[in-house]
Amino acid sequence: MSDNKKNATRICPVSRKCGGCQLMNMTYPEQLKFKQAKVGKLLSGFHKVLPIIGMDEPFHYRNKVQAAFGRTRGGEIISGVYQSSTHNIVKTDSCLIEDKAADEIILTIRKLIKSFKLTVYDERAGRGFLRHVLVKRGFTTNEIMVVLVTGTSAFPSKNDFIKVLLKEHPYITTIVQNVNNKFTSMVLGERETVLYGKGYIEDVLCGCRFRISPKSFYQINPVQTEILYGKAIEFAELKGTEKVIDAYCGIGTITLSMAKHVKHVYGVEIVEQAIIDAKENAKRNNK
């Protein structure tokens, strides 16, 4: 094993299986240098490439954590990420880029599945109760949403399960059951039931307040997102008279951030729930 691979394994025990953080063998400054060279080589013939803007704290920034649930051949219930280019689950207890509270909640759910004698989804057989757990956290508000993606709408011992989960993690803001009973690689299904709380969380980004639902996309790195949006607006050299289209607008984070600087901005999106959230977010921010 090379020194670089040994270093990556020391930092993250599943780095060689997961494939998610492919530059883990480098220090963060080395990663930025590597990316700068790659982008520079690709684009330098067209335009000057400015230095990459890095993060002060490049760990545990990811405010959305998604874990697949399954069993090993020996029958052990596990949760984690899919191995690169496969649907094999790599058992993960914690991750260097994921929100710490989210990882702790997922570990608790793994234990509760065992203690409540619930089943986990068998992808080959197409049956089982728990398929995925999705956790979202508002970076500014600290509100936390837990989405239990299940293969059936029936939830044995539901009330007791939720009660114990909230006792272990009283800071959870809302819990939603999403039912996905189809043979599909898609994580979320169509039907949802709010089990606790209001069914969504809120967060503040670029001075705007946003409602975030289970199916709605929200940038996973809010610290860098604010920098990214700010630079995009700065480089656009807006005069305040422009009409702008925000394609794939999601819940309207770019749309509403841009609205302060232009005459009119149109958000376009295919996901219905995202548009519902976007309209609500426009009202919340008096747009």
Model-derived segments and spans:
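SAM-dependent transferase fold signal centered on methyltransferase-like domains
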Residues: 1-193, 234-241
